[in-house]
Amino acid sequence: MCWTMPSPFTGSSTRNMESGNQSTVTEFIFTGFPQLQDGSLLYFFPLLFIYTFIIIDNLLIFSAVRLDTHLHNPMYNFISIFSFLEIWYTTATIPKMLSNLISEKKAISMTGCILQMYFFHSLENSEGILLTTMAIDRYVAICNPLRYQMIMTPRLCAQLSAGSCLFGFLILLPEIVMISTLPFCGPNQIHQIFCDLVPVLSLACTDTSMILIEDVIHAVTIIITFLIIALSYVRIVTVILRIPSSEGRQKAFSTCAGHLMVFPIFFGSVSLMYLRFSDTYPPVLDTAIALMFTVLAPFFNPIIYSLRNKDMNNAIKKLFCLQKVLNKPGG
């Protein structure tokens, strides 16, 4: 997903005249990382801890939902799919970040860069669409509870989950194919800590206006998903506030509290990353925003879904109890 779009001719017109004397770029160098002598190892271990936490916590959520029959309903099914996507979303960028933190040459191959962009943004797209599906699910459950079971059938839930992932990967494919055919003739320095669409496009030594059109389509898709989610939750909160008993309000709110927290974290981090009043930020601020977007937001999501949810907590406890039983001699 990419909301900020560089000018299609940024950096290309001047490089076109020079491209004949320059060799083709085969790798990109990241300039957003500190050097080893500047203490990059101090960043390595906290990032490794956060990545490990994200993977383990999301695996616990996914496994708990799959193994506990009490959680076999649309809401938890969507949460488990979201956790599964989060595992791969962070894996698309953080392992390479860790590698670059302990390497002298902080580089990535052209093919590796294109693949990282594709999987990172495709997974991000899938998560955004899945969050829209989750908002619609909560809308039906709270605003039309009598027909919920009839509307949100297991078959429909499976179709919505698969459709979210499929659409997320397909919508970016034409743009990535076009980027893979662009000539890059230097420079090859990406002013970021991972391969992102805007920094990479700015290095192309040709016209990128067709890709700009693709970005506009993506922006419209993102705005539509944001509006659907926002309007759904506005309606949900309105209905909850009309429930006469405080116990009923609390019970209804508890079923969507996690979604209400993840929604602003997800779209807030995306907005900070791509909705900019300036094309460039100071390097330190740019890196900090990128870390929040790629690391901190995924770090908080499983905490919200696991620690703040009683049913999920109980399912995870059962998972640990089952593991203890299986580890006993003769178990």
From Swiss-Prot:
Topology of this chain in the membrane: Multi-pass membrane protein
Chief location category: membrane
Alphabetical list of InterPro entries matching this protein: GPCR_Rhodpsn (IPR000276), GPCR_Rhodpsn_7TM (IPR017452), Olfact_rcpt (IPR000725), Olfactory_GPCR1 (IPR050939)
Keywords tagged on the record: Cell membrane, Disulfide bond, G-protein coupled receptor, Glycoprotein, Membrane, Olfaction, Receptor, Sensory transduction, Transducer, Transmembrane, Transmembrane helix
Cytoplasmic topological intervals: 63-70, 137-155, 233-252, 308-331
Extracellular side: 1-41, 92-115, 177-212, 274-286
GO molecular function, one term: olfactory receptor activity
UniProt GO BP: detection of chemical stimulus involved in sensory perception of smell
Glycosylation sites: 21
Cellular localisation: Cell membrane
Keyword Membrane attached: yes
Function: Odorant receptor.
Stated name of the protein: Olfactory receptor 6K3
Effect of residue 216 to M: Found in a renal cell carcinoma sample; somatic mutation
Record's GO cellular component terms: membrane; plasma membrane
PANTHER family: G-PROTEIN COUPLED RECEPTOR, OLFACTORY RECEPTOR
Keyword Glycoprotein annotated: yes
Transmembrane feature ranges: 42-62, 71-91, 116-136, 156-176, 213-232, 253-273, 287-307
Homology family: Belongs to the G-protein coupled receptor 1 family.
Disulfide bridge map: 113-205
Gene that encodes the chain: OR6K3
Lineage of origin: Eukaryota, Metazoa, Chordata, Craniata, Vertebrata
